[in-house]
Amino acid sequence: MSKAHVVGLGKSGVAAARLLKREGWEVVLSDSNTSDTLLKQQQELAKEQITVELGYSLDFAGALPDLIIVSPGVPWDIPDLVKARDLGIETIGEMELAWRHLKSLPWVGITGTNGKTTTTALIAAIFQAAGFDAPACGNIGYAACEVALAEIPPDWIIGEMSSYQIESSVTLAPHISIWTTFTPDHLARHKTLENYYDIKAKLLRQSHLQVFNGDDAYLSKIGASHWPDAYWTSVQGKESLLGEKGFYIEDGWVVEQLPNSPPQRIVEASALRMVGAHNLQNLLMAVAAARLADISPNAIDKAVREFPGVAHRLEHICTWEGIDFINDSKATNYDAAEVGLASVKSPVVLIAGGEAKPGDDTAWLAKIQAQTSAVLLIGSAAPAFAQRLKEVGYTHYEIVETMEKAVRRSLELAKHHQAPVVLLSPACASFDQYPNFEARGDHFRELCLELVGEKETNSNHH
């Protein structure tokens, strides 16, 4: 019996283990951590004859596995995995395993630094409105292997793919691939910008059709020469379209331009309820995917009008006395946080901080100076951010450390400055105080609703 070893006990790892088990593999699933939750999962999986090793790393002394599957959150270049590859053990990502089971079906692959999640969710919504069974998977929705485990295979697979997932996928070749934006984000893992670009480019090279965001400075600069057959998008109209074919916005409409045919209006840009120019870029890419899959403008229009947006991405939580509380916890880098500030009404009371990431904060700091009346700093980045704000001559900041304090103080400051918006847009990872950005956003949501509930109760008593 062939032996497989799955690294990482998240939902992706568990789904991969179940898929391999079903195929007749002997499966060990390991995680370097241990906790009550993991111990409970260990007992559950034992009933399915899947061995779970906790607080464990790969052991090269005993019998070696024939195949190693790596969960999306596990760095591709940790010593264990480098050693496994040097020993000639086939080592692939969970997404690649799913692809091997589902490669007879058409995939849409979405990658990029920012904008992936919204674009993926919108594409899935459009395909579903057109009557397709088209689950979103990968970084959002299901783990890719959960889709592979389904009794009845879907019509399309809409996969959000991080650079880690692409790096660990050897043969993954979607029918349509989309590259949303390219900014130096995950450099800790990928060492250099070129390396990070090459990884993402691999996905598009292996795809049948490519769609690029032509409004992204980096992609448009290198794009036309590298990708002569691609479809480009631009929110700035036909003049800004790279190449002969693509999708652009003109007179408030998304317009399709294909070779040898007149431009065709597909959907009104105002049909999308989400705020911000960057969401029009996401809309264009989603429409491009839908049209390349021959989906009718009617289905596109219906899906776009009904699309609610994405949690943790400029998510409107509540309004109290004219002050909007907005959760943008997904803004884990300077670029995304700058977009967040640009997309809401100003002046803003901004909550920022967490675990800082490398990057250029210049544009973000300028946006803070232009748009905010106060900044509340949380998490381990707070002292460094305070220092940076001081250096650019911005003094309306306070270090509050925790989300609880930040939310309470934000309401006081918003009232004082008559600011219409309290915005959580951290520009940081969340790992100093939370398991992930979702947990951070959920906590913010909870605190806002609690605070507003309290205020309403109090005002009813007077």
UniProtKB/Swiss-Prot annotation:
Record key words, sorted: ATP-binding, Cell cycle, Cell division, Cell shape, Cell wall biogenesis/degradation, Cytoplasm, Ligase, Nucleotide-binding, Peptidoglycan synthesis
Enzyme class, broadest EC rank: ligase
Gene Ontology biological process terms, A to Z: cell division; cell wall organization; peptidoglycan biosynthetic process; regulation of cell shape
Catalytic activity: UDP-N-acetyl-alpha-D-muramoyl-L-alanine + D-glutamate + ATP = UDP-N-acetyl-alpha-D-muramoyl-L-alanyl-D-glutamate + ADP + phosphate + H(+)
Pfam family, one: Mur_ligase_C
Keyword Hydrolase attached: no
Function according to Swiss-Prot or TrEMBL: Cell wall formation. Catalyzes the addition of glutamate to the nucleotide precursor UDP-N-acetylmuramoyl-L-alanine (UMA).
Family, similarity comment: Belongs to the MurCDEF family.
Name of protein: UDP-N-acetylmuramoylalanine--D-glutamate ligase
Pathway info: Cell wall biogenesis; peptidoglycan biosynthesis
Record GO cellular component, one term: cytoplasm
Transmembrane regions: none
Enzyme Commission code: 6.3.2.9
Subcellular location: Cytoplasm
Major localization class: cytoplasm
PANTHER family tied to this protein: UDP-N-ACETYLMURAMOYLALANINE--D-GLUTAMATE LIGASE (PTHR43692:SF1)
Source organism (scientific name): Nostoc sp. (strain PCC 7120 / SAG 25.82 / UTEX 2576)
Residues engaged in binding ATP: 112-118
Gene Ontology MF: a single term: UDP-N-acetylmuramoylalanine-D-glutamate ligase activity
